[in-house]
Amino acid sequence: MASSEELTATGYIQHHLQNLTYGKLPAGYVRHNADGTHTELAANTWTFAHTAQEAKDMGFMAVHVDTLGWGIFLALLLGFIFRSAVKKAHTGKPSGLLSFVEFLVEGINSVVKDIFHHKNRLIAPMGLTIFSWVFMMNLMDLIPVDWLPMLAQVVTGDSHTFFKVVPTTDPNATLGMAFTVFALMIMFSIKEKGALGFVKELTCHPFFAPKKLWYLNILLIPVNTILETVALIAKPISLGLRLFGNMYAGEMIFILIALLFSVGLVMGFVGGVLQWAWAVFHILVITLQAFIFMVLTTVYMAMAHDNHDEH
């Protein structure tokens, strides 16, 4: 991975946890090269980060190229798989792929119907898309941690190239998806209840006074607004961090197991057994995390359609 002089356990772990980052470094920035020399930039420069510090110094506008690349690639692959299944369905010839896709669609549709009791034809396809895409991104965690990063280093010719292959171990990806769900939740809530109904939901719940003491509701508005706003914002944050935390922990365990291969033949054998065992268990984790993300998204969509005034 990193050069031989930097290949310590700490360096190995840090290298695997760093994304391939593209961003802008300011004029006058001093870059530390792999050969020990330094280069001062004469102008603002858009470039790939060579170190974790450079990635940090690029700031908020930096892009994690590996996360975006794998996310888009897996989305396109998923679209190709579903398109192939649809074509086979039109020919009337049964196949393993078609049977699997039908099983997946029926299963997700059943789960969504149990949670979402309103009329919106977009929710079931949304649930299917979210589950499938998150599962595909999680599935990348089963690829041995060194294979694709080493391939990236061979292609670039740079032994210091960073390359993470599991998009869901990047909080930018998981929180990005979560806040997209949050935006849809707000949109559907306003669409179903109106802007006034949405504001009323934020200001008149969970505490409200009886009709005889209606004037007390004015005093409760600040309390309700604070509580509901915190609860609302907590939904996407917890949704994104839950997925990130579980996948990050799983990836870290794979990296720690991979370190055993550098200790010796016996520990390498132990590492192989542990890696196989953890991979088998991790299949459950990646599936469960995709399912939880989909279920919570559906729950939030149902909450957006619920009207408290009807109860």
UniProtKB/Swiss-Prot annotation:
InterPro entries, per the entry: ATP_syn_F0_a_bact/chloroplast, ATP_synth_F0_asu, ATP_synth_F0_asu_AS, F0_ATP_A_sf
The keyword NAD is assigned to this record: no
Compartments in which it is found: Cell inner membrane
Segments passing through the bilayer: 62-82, 123-143, 170-190, 213-233, 253-273, 276-296
Pfam families reported for this sequence: ATP-synt_A
UniProt keyword Iron present: no
Subunit structure: F-type ATPases have 2 components, CF(1) - the catalytic core - and CF(0) - the membrane proton channel. CF(1) has five subunits: alpha(3), beta(3), gamma(1), delta(1), epsilon(1). CF(0) has three main subunits: a(1), b(2) and c(9-12). The alpha and beta chains form an alternating ring which encloses part of the gamma chain. CF(1) is attached to CF(0) by a central stalk formed by the gamma and epsilon chains, while a peripheral stalk is formed by the delta and b chains.
Protein name per Swiss-Prot or TrEMBL: ATP synthase subunit a
Organism: Saccharophagus degradans (strain 2-40 / ATCC 43961 / DSM 17024)
Function: Key component of the proton channel; it plays a direct role in the translocation of protons across the membrane.
Top-level taxonomy: Bacteria, Pseudomonadati, Pseudomonadota, Gammaproteobacteria, Cellvibrionales
